[in-house]
Regions:
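Conserved PLP cofactor-binding pocket of PLP-dependent enzymes
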Residues: 420-442
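Short beta-strand "wing" residues that participate in macromolecule-binding interfaces
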Residues: 66-68, 169, 425-426
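Structural signature of PLP-dependent enzymes
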Residues: 334-341, 357-381
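N-terminal basic, amphipathic alpha-helical segments
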Residues: 1-133, 335, 339-345, 375, ...
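Conserved core of the PLP fold type I
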Residues: 141-275, 287-300, 462, 466-470
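Glycine-centered flexible beta-alpha turn that most often forms the glycine-rich phosphate-binding loop
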Residues: 282
Length: 471
């Protein structure tokens, strides 16, 4: 087929991607051809399973492969064969890109308990409308670009908000971005190179996993626990092959909803210092946490921590305004990278967010939102427990519950069946650094009040029980 060269400067992941894409492009591998399984290819070529997983996932994302549950990987029909593809032919392709595409399509599935945002009537809509009216009534230039680091008054306000969390910094240490995903992308492109070992929560944010794979990173999952982390595993992974960065979400972790204890956070900082690792802290749900909870940034004071957060979850995801804070030299580098990639961020959006934040009703809205989420957690968690689901933890805050049922072995199969009922679920394999099959599911509690979702789950559990009894 093709030969891998371990001494090459090109990563093994990229060699596999290049090898297969060439075979498909030249017609050696034709549409519909079945490919070696991940384990078969890894064994035949003497590489790790994770290397092949990364390569296959990139080939799926680039349109060369399609993954079919329980069947394996196949060469996807190319564009010239599109007229031969039956309607709905991609329904089996529930990979990272399918999830990212369908979850944001307004014309897609109408019930989305697997999504990652709040319903419109839970957001600060009135505050946004007041900010828009204020902005429209004043004088604002629509020529030129905004500040490279973002709208200065908003950066100053972020500085003050972080000071309330015991993080001491200057305005120059803050960079505004187009949401937290943009911030994660910038820091990843600054710190991660193809072939690098990168530590990441397991499970983790699906979009981050996908983005790091595209950079050619070797993802090393640090198992999350209800208390925080598998600390023994973390230290083991830090010893070999010596990763230099750890992307983590200590508070209201996505997808599990768990928050790390103070003892676990101190230990993570100790290990980062011992092994010279940069910690990228994703804290986008901090405004949803009703309990006083320190951040890694507050414990470290941005010496080794890069802090990322966003206003998308509580004000409006459509505005796409986030930020990062860190060591002055690193923030200057990231500001330069931001300019190279897309010039400045959207100052109009930043001004709207600023107007919403200085609105006297903002803090009351945030408090009401936290109370509403707590009430929803109690109700939805009880519902899942009544149905026989296991909860990873009961966070009683934030947006997510991470659940599994003893009758459901592979959540991906359930998610595929859910699409036939106009329901989009969040199956666990999408949040796995290695894309391993998983029985776990992420549920957004704010979208779980639709009885159709629970009716479907109950039917599937009963169906699985009948199949088990028949076997």
């Amino acid at each position: 087929m093709f030969v891998l060269d371990s001494s090459s400067s090109v990563s093994l992941v990229q060699q596999i991607v290049d090898g297969f894409s060439h075979l498909v492009d030249e017609g050696t591998l034709r549409s519909g051809a079945k490919l070696p399984s991940i384990r078969q290819f890894a064994h035949a070529h003497g590489v790790s399973v994770y290397t092949v997983v990364d390569a296959y996932d990139r080939l799926v994302a680039q349109g060369y492969f399609v993954s079919r549950p329980h069947l394996g990987f196949f060469v996807r029909r190319r564009r010239q064969d599109d007229e031969q593809v039956p309607a709905g032919g991609d329904r089996y392709d529930f990979d990272s890109m399918y999830y990212m595409r369908r979850i944001f399509e307004h014309r897609g599935l109408s019930r989305k308990p697997g999504c990652g945002w709040l319903p419109e009537d839970w957001l600060f809509g009135e505050g946004v409308r007041r900010a828009l009216r204020t902005l429209a009534s004043g004088e604002i230039s629509i020529s030129g670009y905004g500040e490279p680091k973002g709208f200065v008054p908003l950066r100053q306000l972020v500085r003050d908000l972080l000071a309330e969390q015991e993080v001491a910094l200057t305005t120059e240490q803050i960079l505004l971005t187009q949401g937290s995903s943009h911030a994660l992308d910038l820091i990843a492109r600054r710190l991660v190179h193809a072939g690098d070992a990168v530590l990441i929560d397991d499970p983790s944010y699906a979009n981050l996993c996908f983005g790091l794979r595209l950079l050619g990173a070797d993802l090393l999952g640090v198992t999350r626990t209800p208390e925080g982390y598998d600390l023994a595993l973390l230290e083991h992974l830090l010893q070999t092959p010596r990763p230099k960065v750890f992307f983590t979400q200590p508070r209201l972790h996505c997808p599990t909803g768990a928050s790390a204890t103070l003892a676990h956070m101190y230990r993570v900082l100790q290990l980062a210092e011992k092994y010279d690792v940069t910690l990228v802290e994703n804290d986008i749900y901090s405004d949803l946490d009703p309990r006083p909870h320190p951040s890694l940034a507050s414990l470290d004071q941005l010496k080794r921590v890069v802090y990322i957060s966003s206003f998308s979850k509580t004000i409006s995801p459509n505005l796409r305004v986030g930020y990062m804070a860190g060591h002055p030299e690193l923030i200057e580098d990231l500001a330069q990278l931001k300019m190279i990639a897309g010039l400045t961020s959207a100052e109009l959006s930043e001004r709207i967010v600023y107007g919403a934040l200085i609105d006297g009703r903002w803090r009351k809205h945030a408090k009401t939102l936290r109370e509403r989420l707590t009430a929803a957690h109690e109700k939805i968690a009880a519902r899942f427990l009544e149905m026989g689901f296991e909860l990873f933890t009961e966070p009683k805050a934030g947006m997510f519950l991470w659940v599994r049922h003893p009758q459901i072995a592979d959540a991906n199969v359930l998610a595929l069946r859910a699409t036939e009922h106009d329901i989009l679920l969040g199956p666990g394999h999408l949040f796995s650094p290695g894309l391993e099959p998983s029985p776990w599911l992420r549920f957004n509690i704010a979208f779980c009040e639709d009885e159709a979702v629970f009716d479907f789950l109950q039917q599937e559990i009963a169906r699985a029980q009948k199949l088990g009894a028949a076997a």
